[in-house]
Amino acid sequence: MVNILHIDSSPRAERSHSRELSKEFVSAWRAAHPEDAIAYRDLGHHPVPHVNEAWIAAAFSPPETHTPELAEAIRVSDELVDEFLAADRYVFGVPMYNFNIPSTFKAYIDQIVRINRTVSLDAQGFRGLVEGKKAVIITARGGDFSATSPAVAYDFQEPYLRTIFGFIGITDIQFINANSLNEGDARTQSLAEARAAIQDAIAQW
């Protein structure tokens, strides 16, 4: 049995392309692999807290030294990290906002990138602790940020996500980018291509 963590980050509901596509991926996977367990987290509708001063103090001090206040400050982060580490694979639905990810998803990443939980630091430098896992990241973009587009230089979304998840040890990442979703006929073609990519990804995942 494979444990999958499915996360959406769009604040939109029915009109969200990233939600629609990530749901299609998970539904198709569930149909093909009914024995697998799928956990779901909706960051768009149920955002996690941003880090604050108490969180930082707790994250960079031994748990046995925590006061009740520091223990409470880090409690949600501990729960999120536990959930994250319990998964074998990840499906993320991520819209592009201002060339990058929604702040809700950034807040989540800040909560799970934790010294001695998901990344370690020693004399040799940083080492990701989340190894041997896979991720599919489904993005939705209003414009064309594909590799052949002049606007690709504005795509800070995919490079950031590759970097931050690679930093904690997840390097087996497949992106399914739905571009040009604000462009009429191009939207229809882009969604069709994304759906085809979803089927290919499921066959290979």
Swiss-Prot record:
Q: Which cofactor does it need?
A: FMN
Q: Which residues bind FMN?
A: S10, S16, H17, S18, M96, Y97, N98, F99
Keyword S-adenosyl-L-methionine among record annotations: no
Which enzyme type, at the first EC level? oxidoreductase
Per the UniProt entry, the Enzyme Commission number(s) are 1.6.5.-, 1.7.1.17
Q: Give the record's family classification.
A: Belongs to the azoreductase type 1 family.
* Source organism, top-level taxon: Bacteria
Name of the gene this protein is made from:
azoR
Query: What protein does this entry describe?
Result: FMN-dependent NADH:quinone oxidoreductase
One annotated GO molecular function: oxidoreductase activity, acting on NAD(P)H as acceptor
User: What does the entry's cofactor note say about binding and number?
Assistant: Binds 1 FMN per subunit.
Q: What does this protein do?
A: Quinone reductase that provides resistance to thiol-specific stress caused by electrophilic quinones.
Looking up SUPFAM superfamilies in the UniProt record yields:
Flavoproteins
The cross-references to InterPro entries, in alphabetical order and at most eight, read: Flavodoxin_fold, Flavoprotein-like_sf, FMN-dep_NADH:Q_OxRdtase_AzoR1, NADH:quinone_OxRdtase_FMN_depd
Query: Which terms are listed as keywords in the entry?
Result: Flavoprotein, FMN, NAD, Oxidoreductase
Give the multimer and partner information: Homodimer.
Catalytic reaction list: 2 a quinone + NADH + H(+) = 2 a 1,4-benzosemiquinone + NAD(+); N,N-dimethyl-1,4-phenylenediamine + anthranilate + 2 NAD(+) = 2-(4-dimethylaminophenyl)diazenylbenzoate + 2 NADH + 2 H(+)
